[in-house]
Amino acid sequence: MTMLKLALFFLVVSLIAGLFGFTGISAASAGIAKILFVIFLIVFVVLLVMALAAGKAIL
């Protein structure tokens, strides 16, 4: 699975667990989703800076 699919999976798991009131599972899944979000954000910024430094078209 790609990291994006894992992030979406943990988001869905945390929402479902939240509906059923399993706060431990919900908090753990939400925590993993937050960590994956930060990782994706850092990778995006690094790649954006690299593309701008290389002078290549981004989109």
Swiss-Prot record:
Belongs to the UPF0391 family. It holds the Pfam family DUF1328. It comes from Granulibacter bethesdensis (strain ATCC BAA-1260 / CGDNIH1). This is UPF0391 membrane protein GbCGDNIH1_2123. It is found in: Cell membrane. It comes from the Bacteria. The chain crosses the membrane at residues 6-26, 35-55. The lineage of its organism: Bacteria, Pseudomonadati, Pseudomonadota, Alphaproteobacteria, Acetobacterales. InterPro entries: DUF1328. Keywords: Cell membrane, Membrane, Transmembrane, Transmembrane helix. One of its GO terms (cellular component) is plasma membrane. It is a multi-pass membrane protein.
